[in-house]
Amino acid sequence: MTQQVPLIIKLGGALLETEGALTSFIGGIQRFLQQFPRPLVLVHGGGCLVDDLLKALGKTSTKKNGLRVTPADQIPYVVGALAGTANKQMMAEAIAQGLNPVGLSLADGGLCDVTQLDPEFGNV
């Protein structure tokens, strides 16, 4: 039996804040998979959700060269926004459109082995 290489798509967080965009995108994915069945991995952003949550909590969000600088005390909020809110919004839409998603974060199941590239960016 031959395994298919999964199609990997990286989504920007703007997809989650633009009305109707996620519904439209997932609908397109569903139609694509009907015609071309294969494993699919969606990697999502959610910086807008992180920014909104930090602002609501009275915390500042600092960026350096367009990348978020994340102090240790903000990690629970960043994880909540990305692995919680963003992930579950995408899963709910996929389920509503008849797909069978599994939501994971990079911390699940030893999926990633990471090395900090620059300590100036904090804990992400």
Residue ranges: model-predicted function:
Residues 1-124:
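Nucleotide/pyrophosphate-binding catalytic subdomain
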